[in-house]
Amino acid sequence: MFALCDVNSFYASCETVFRPDLCGRPVVVLSNNDGCVIACSAEAKQLGIAPGEPYFKQKERFRRSGVVCFSSNYELYADMSNRVMTTLEEMVPRVEIYSIDEAFCDLTGVRNCRDLTDFGREIRATVLKRTHLTVGVGIAQTKTLAKLANHAAKKWQRQTGGGVDLSNIDRQRRLLALIPVEDVWGVGRRISKKLNALGIKTALDLSEQSTWIIRKHFNVVLERTVRELCGEPCLELEEFAPAKQEIVCSRSFGERVTDYEEMRQAVYSYAARAAEKLRGEHQYCRFISTFVKTSPFALNEPYYGNSAAVTLLTPTQDSRDIINAAVKCLDKIWRDGHRYQKAGVMLGDFFSQGVAQLNLFDDNAPRAGSAKLMEVLDHLNAKDGKGTLYFAGQGMSQQWAMKREMLSPRYTTRYSDLLRVK
């Protein structure tokens, strides 16, 4: 038995948690460089605002409608997500973190001692009490059915109270008949068009199809979906995310970059951040790549995009090694006279910690005290906020940095941003 817990309007809700004065007001969160809408509160959705709308086109409309806009505050969202997931892990045997705002919970054995509907309400109430975030809870025998139960819990929140137990077969069929096939987890628009052409309009229609025919005309993934809709678990709970095969750190610049020194600072920063992520995965890498590009949509400007890579003989997780390699790559591809829109650093060819081997022919031997130095660096930045300790090459002003002109405070991760109660 699975429960899918999904935070309602997560990004927007994180902003309103610390701003009770925004209760009942439309709130939107913008993408990198305040480009377009990526999240809306329920009040904003009622005004017809949808994700993907460019901010510069809607700015005047937002002002007239009293819409409150925020730049993306990823540090706040990550910490609030961690609080939600920690709460869930205390309440259920196992948890699979599916995304920043949703998780699958293992309810094996719970129904033997608890009513599942009551338990779903308890999960919802506990998360609300600890984080002031509202979650929808969908309970069913399979992940796909739990997704649909969660969809119903959020769509008909007033009738369901934010939680739906879909373990009853008759209730399953009634709900499946109401759900368009394109809303089924894993179906998507392209496949739904083919299904509609075959007369398969709803989730119930799909569940009644022969698995053999579905596999023959589509694929094994859709066959699993059909089996899951019929209550046959095909997707197991994954407590541990598979090891990453690569790490990419890149951003579009707040302003076009034309100066080499500014680009070098950006590559320094991206490489340092990528190295930090690498250590967080307890991995070493040998492959480091840097890319730069101009905007393909800029009028009367030639497009230029290029990348270069370095393969180290000895795997490393030291920020200094990764930064040096990334800057060498930049030197190979930098061309004067362009207005660069974006750059990034990619790491690959990973080795697990303790498995990486030295190379006799490598001139760059591992640095003495490297592991301890990186540990101190990560500890201070985790404790006092990202960027507390940084490399001089990253620069101080960082005029190229991503625009976040409406950034809210990092209420939960920076002492300087703690709320003051009067």
Predicted stretch roles:
Residues V327-K383, G387:
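C-terminal hydrophobic structural anchor segments
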Residues G109-V110, T142-A146, V292-A298, G348-Q353, ...:
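Short, internal active-site loops enriched in acidic
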Residues C23-R25, L133, Y284-I288, N306-A308, ...:
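A generic structural signal for short beta-strands and their flanking turns/coil linkers
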